[in-house]
């Protein structure tokens, strides 16, 4: 099926048919390439944004859950360090180690999740280790 365009519909056409020399053709082709590329890139960007938003919506609750648990662990260790750090230097050492091991870019890295973004046992082991350590300090200082 061939679609015929009128002169009014042809946005790439010239207003002055007599001036369709080689220079104008190159300019029109270059303009067509620029607009085509821009349209292509806009389409790619739009698709990426939609997929990124969907991924964010799906995984935010999981990230928030782990962020809360990590915040609780580090917060309690910081409290124990403030209250008992002078008498028990191990508390301060544990706080420093926990802050290193539980940094968000380490916890939410690909090594702790499968292809469906479900947590692997390595993440559960890491969090359990620090939760147990906090429980030990709670028992010791309560």
From Swiss-Prot:
GO terms for biological process: protein maturation. The keyword Nucleus applies. InterPro entries: Essential_protein_Yae1_N, Yae1-like. Residues 1-24 are annotated as: Disordered. Keywords: Cytoplasm, Nucleus. One of its GO terms (cellular component) is nucleus. It comes from the Eukaryota. It is found in: Cytoplasm; Nucleus. PANTHER family: PROTEIN YAE1 HOMOLOG (PTHR18829:SF0). This is Protein YAE1. It comes from Kluyveromyces lactis (strain ATCC 8585 / CBS 2359 / DSM 70799 / NBRC 1267 / NRRL Y-1140 / WM37) (Yeast). The gene is YAE1.
